[in-house]
């Protein structure tokens, strides 16, 4: 029975840690850049777009170029955000000794 109690304690500790990580992920921000810094976007948490900044020098250019740069900057920010979330999850689950091998969370 001691093993079961220990497993339950580990599960409760993991649940608390996962709630903490979820909050951290929701507050994490990532910047994406395209066109050598001419277009920047900022994302939060699960991909919420916070801001778009476009250098004034692009305003007279072809709108399709600006649209492509916005997409590229968004993609860059998304990749950075995904990496930050992955790093946070690795840190959060490191102390559980492989208790959940191959387990992926939906965020």
Swiss-Prot record:
Entry keyword Manganese: no
Chief place of localization: cytoplasm
Keywords: Cytoplasm, DNA-binding
Disulfide cross-links: none
InterPro entries, sorted: YbaB-like_sf, YbaB/EbfC
Subunit organization: Homodimer.
Similarity annotation: Belongs to the YbaB/EbfC family.
Protein's name according to its UniProt entry: Nucleoid-associated protein HNE_0371
């Amino acid at each position: 029975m001691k093993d079961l109690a220990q497993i339950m304690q580990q599960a409760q500790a993991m649940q608390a840690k996962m709630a903490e990580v979820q909050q951290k992920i929701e507050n994490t921000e990532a910047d994406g850049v395209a066109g050598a810094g001419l277009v920047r976007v900022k994302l939060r948490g699960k991909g919420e777009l916070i801001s778009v900044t476009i250098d004034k020098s692009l305003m007279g250019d072809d709108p399709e170029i600006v649209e492509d740069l916005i997409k590229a900057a968004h993609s860059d920010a998304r990749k950075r955000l995904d990496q930050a979330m992955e790093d946070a999850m690795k840190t959060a689950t490191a102390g559980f000794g492989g208790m959940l091998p191959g387990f992926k969370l939906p965020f």
